[in-house]
Amino acid sequence: MELHIIFLILGGLLIVLLAGFSIYSARREKSRIFSNTFTTRQPATPIKNIVTDVPATLDPLQYGQNPVPTENESESETGHSVQIQQEVENSLREIKINLPVQETAEYTQTPLNTPIYHNQPAQPTFLQTAPPIEPLTIPTVEPIQPETTSVLEQSLEELERQAAERELDLYSDASVRIELAKNSIQTPIEEVAQPESTVITQNNIITLYVVAPEGQQFDGHYVVQSLEALGFQFGEYQIYHRHQHLGNNDTPVIFSVANMMQPGIFDLNNLDSYATVGLVLFMHLPSEGSDLVNLKLMLKAAESLAEALGGFILNEQRELFNETDRQAYFARVS
């Protein structure tokens, strides 16, 4: 316990000594700073009254001193101040500001909205005048006379009539095209006497049409490829025939395919430029073998061609072929 008390006393003494030393050193530093800034030492030589030319009005105030002027000094000071004021006024009158004549002229003549350049000569200004704008004249449109309208109507009617005639020529009857194809053959045909002559009528021919969509045509290469893929053979009258036995041209023809466009033939030498609006399939009655079987084969061939070429099947009246037409065709050969 005694050692503990002794250590506490020693610690307190050390703290007191440190605090006192710090206070002493702070005061000493403060006194040193103030001793360098302010001094109370009297000047070595006393300041004497020196007479200057500065008037009493311009003499700075002397703080802490209140001299008592005498009568002579006050009179001399007033006279001296009056003299100084007169000299100042005279010097002010003599002061004149002289500007060069050219510069003053520039300052007076130059407008405010233009920049002033003293060292550069005046530049000439050029005025550009726009060409006069002429008034726009709008031409007057004369109304169409009734006579001109009637001429246009007549020309339109004539064009429609010619288009209808061309369409009739394209979709001409199959029997007429077959006759034309027969007449086009230049080789002479010897007449053979037959015991019985048969007259071919419309009822003895069954016809189907495969036509392209409106405004389109079948390409010649696709037509030939499709026909040959279905077993048709190019032969007599320059058209394609379907023989009773596929691949055997010596067997009888059961039905044929012709071009709807005149003269109804297939020009294999010019397939690049060949195109047609449709094909016509026809079968003569009676045919070789069963007419019903041959008719079913022709219907199947027409459907395959329409699917391959992207066309439509029409009946003999050039209407869309439907189930009713199918039954009517079967009734004709039964």
Swiss-Prot record:
Topological domain spans for side Periplasmic: 1-2
Keyword terms: Cell cycle, Cell division, Cell inner membrane, Cell membrane, Membrane, Transmembrane, Transmembrane helix
Gene Ontology biological-process annotations: division septum assembly; FtsZ-dependent cytokinesis
GO cellular component, one term: cell division site
Topology, Cytoplasmic side: 24-334
Pfam families to which the protein is assigned, alphabetical: ZipA_C
Primary localization class, coarse: membrane
Residues annotated as transmembrane: 3-23
InterPro entries named in the record: Cell_div_ZipA, ZipA_FtsZ-bd_C, ZipA_FtsZ-bd_C_sf
Assembly and binders: Interacts with FtsZ via their C-terminal domains.
Name assigned to this protein: Cell division protein ZipA
Organism of derivation: Haemophilus ducreyi (strain 35000HP / ATCC 700724)
Record lineage: Bacteria, Pseudomonadati, Pseudomonadota, Gammaproteobacteria, Pasteurellales
